[in-house]
Design a protein with these regions (language model features):
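Conserved phosphate-binding/catalytic region of the ribokinase-like
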Residues: 106-110, 166-280
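Conserved beta-alpha-beta core of the PfkB/ribokinase-like small-molecule kinase fold
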Residues: 84-174, 182, 190-191
């Protein structure tokens, strides 16, 4: 993040949420990226651009491999206690940040940390990048698709599956990738299709008429899914997988019932209580 007011506010919030900041990088020559989000009458969000910056790039475009290398012993210690390394694909729009995430993949592999990728296709980030604005859409898709070969777990939306794989079958998507990852495909309020641990299925997720803001719903879904994967160790049958997906769906829904991508994120306990109420 940039050493600006937004960066400072995030640090305050991270501290309040007890987020480990050991590897947080602050840069004086770039800005914290502030995303402009608009909503329609149904609460569905779309990204309309970014707040103007006085710098030539945003801080997330210059995530430094060298700074992480200086903390390599701390990183190894952290990875010894880590089950999943989670990333999106936006970092690939900058070669500097891309180099860093590939370095982290190397370290994760050494310590058997699994990689979770949320495809999270956001073309506006590429369009506004001084590094990649001139790269064609086809080339962007190719770069991201190659990146997905590092995934042990892949989460993507239905429209992303169509764009990157030309179909929405999670089993076939898994078979097209190097590590044959577990694949979860979301589709808004519609059922989730998945291929997990050699099993394939479709799971209904809870819906509501009171949707306020869908910003952050995908992140909450993935956070809920990962927390359940950790609690199970690894789901071994269809019932356990469906439980993971339903809990993830609850987390996504709860985030949609109020404004904002952070404030509405539910706790594990809140998600569990909500799911129990639905079942009963």
């Amino acid at each position: 993040m940039g050493s600006d007011d937004y960066g400072k506010r995030f640090i305050t919030q991270f501290n309040e949420l007890d987020v480990n900041l050991d590897f947080l990088q602050l840069d004086n020559d770039s800005s914290t990226r502030v995303v402009n989000v608009d909503r329609d009458q149904f609460g569905d969000r779309f990204f309309s651009g970014f707040e103007e910056s006085s710098h030539s790039c945003f801080a997330d475009e210059i995530l430094s491999k060298k700074l992480i290398e200086k903390e390599i012993l701390n990183l190894e210690k952290t990875f010894l206690e880590t089950k999943y390394l989670v990333t999106g694909t936006i970092l690939l729009s900058s070669p500097i940040s891309a180099e860093t995430i590939f370095f982290l993949f190397e370290q994760a592999k050494k310590l058997e940390v699994k990689v979770v990728i949320d495809l999270n296709w956001r073309e506006v980030f590429w369009d506004h990048s001084s590094f990649s604005s001139k790269i064609s859409k086809d080339q962007r898709v190719k770069i991201i698709k190659n990146f997905l070969n590092h995934a042990h777990v892949l989460k993507l939306a239905k429209e992303e599956a169509t764009l990157f794989f030309e179909h929405e079958n999670p089993l076939l998507i898994s078979q097209q990738l190097l590590k044959q990852p577990d694949v979860i495909i979301t589709d808004g309020k519609n059922p989730v299709s998945w291929y997990f641990n050699g099993l394939q299925g479709i799971t209904e997720t809870p819906t509501s008429q009171k949707i306020v803001d869908t910003t952050g719903a995908g992140d909450a879904f993935l956070a809920g899914l990962i927390s359940k994967l950790i609690s199970y160790g690894y789901p071994s049958n269809k019932l356990e997988i469906e439980d993971c997906v339903k809990f993830a769906g609850v987390c996504g829904l709860l985030t949609c019932l109020g404004e904002g991508a952070i404030e509405q994120q539910p706790s594990y306990e809140k998600g569990t209580r909500f799911l129990e109420c639905l079942i009963s």
